[in-house]
Design a protein with these regions (language model features):
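Short, surface-exposed secondary-structure boundary micro-motifs
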Residues: 52, 57-58
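Conserved beta-strand/loop element in small beta-rich adapter and peptidoglycan-binding domains
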Residues: 1-3, 47-48, 52
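Acidic, glycine-rich catalytic/binding loops that coordinate metals and/or anionic ligands
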Residues: 42-48, 71-141
Length: 141
């Protein structure tokens, strides 16, 4: 997603520090949630944008199916998708919904709405990698 060092891994979680001080409570950090322990990136690994962090799973909390969550923090505070700086994932810009789990991604003419059911129809696959992002295709408004 962005260049930075992996500073923590745990039950379904990977935390990446983006400012290089090794402390994910200062500056920018990215949290990846529901990451499988199988082939998960190790603490101390420096990632570049596009590097694989691990595999989607149900680890790290209650889940009805394999999926991933991404979040960002600045100085230890959660930053919303639409808060100031856009959150862009492989060309898809994230937007807040009216409540939790109701956001959407937008990339040109494509609009992808969050779907709590998450199934085959709720994914984006980057052809150049094994990484998958889950979505439900919906017509653009």
């Amino acid at each position: 997603m962005a260049p930075g060092e992996v500073v923590y891994t745990g039950n379904g979680v990977v935390v990446q520090d983006l400012d290089g001080d090794g402390n994910w409570q200062t500056g920018w950090s990215i949290l990846y949630m529901h990451v499988s322990s199988w082939e998960r990136v190790a603490v101390g690994t420096y990632l570049e944008a596009g590097d694989q962090v691990g595999h989607a799973s149900c680890e790290g909390g209650v889940s009805t199916g394999t999926h991933l969550h991404f979040a960002r923090k600045y100085n230890g505070e959660w930053v919303l998708a639409d808060d100031g700086l856009p959150f862009v994932l492989s060309g898809y810009r994230a937007h807040n919904g009216e409540s939790y789990y109701e956001g959407y991604l937008e990339n040109g003419e494509k609009t992808v709405t969050a779907n709590i059911a998450g199934n085959y129809w709720t994914r984006i696959i980057r052809p150049e990698s094994r990484a998958e992002f889950f979505y439900t295709p919906t017509p653009r408004k």
